[in-house]
């Protein structure tokens, strides 16, 4: 099916379900999962949009997700990195291309509904920016 699965996570409940879906897809084909956690950096004080996660928290959460899949017998790698506010979808699409992902898995809504209101859905943007299939999990 898919030898390489990219799953984009952000600590939301939908991301937890996306992680489970990525695990299942990889298990079906003895594939590999790449977990990507992007931390938006820009602070826009007048709008009240600030990074709500420290780099340490991001890495701890990523390590937990990697361990979960590894303990389930899935080949897994992970990366947590910073991105510019509003560039998350482009980063996800570029990462899928760079690492040869056959499919991108992500949650339908992330942690911030306010961000979704102003910028649109990250999942929607990824669908339009990539030539890869995208599985959106709710």
Describe the role of every protein-language-model region.
Residues 3-48, 52, 70-77:
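Small/aliphatic-rich secondary-structure junction motif
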Residues 34, 79, 83-84, 95, ...:
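Internal alpha/beta domain cores that form substrate/cofactor-binding pockets in large enzymes
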Residues 50-60:
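A short acidic, glycine-rich active-site loop
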Residues 70-104:
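Structural beta-alpha unit
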Residues 103-125:
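Glycine-rich, Arg-bearing micro-motifs that act as flexible, cationic patches
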Residues 134-137:
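Short, flexible loop segments at boundaries between secondary-structure elements
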């Amino acid at each position: 099916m898919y030898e390489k699965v990219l799953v984009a996570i952000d600590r939301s409940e939908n991301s937890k379900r996306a992680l489970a879906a990525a695990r299942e897809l990889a298990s079906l084909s003895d594939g590999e999962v790449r977990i990507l956690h992007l931390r938006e950096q820009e602070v826009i004080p007048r709008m009240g949009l600030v990074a709500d996660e420290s780099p340490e928290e991001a890495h701890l959460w990523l390590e937990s997700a990697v361990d979960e899949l590894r303990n389930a017998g899935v080949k897994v790698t992970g990366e947590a990195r910073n991105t510019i506010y509003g560039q998350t979808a482009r980063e996800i699409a570029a990462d899928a291309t760079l690492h040869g992902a056959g499919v991108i898995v992500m949650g339908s809504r992330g942690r911030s509904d306010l961000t979704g209101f102003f910028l649109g859905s990250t999942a929607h943007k990824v669908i339009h920016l990539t030539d890869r299939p995208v599985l959106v999990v709710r």
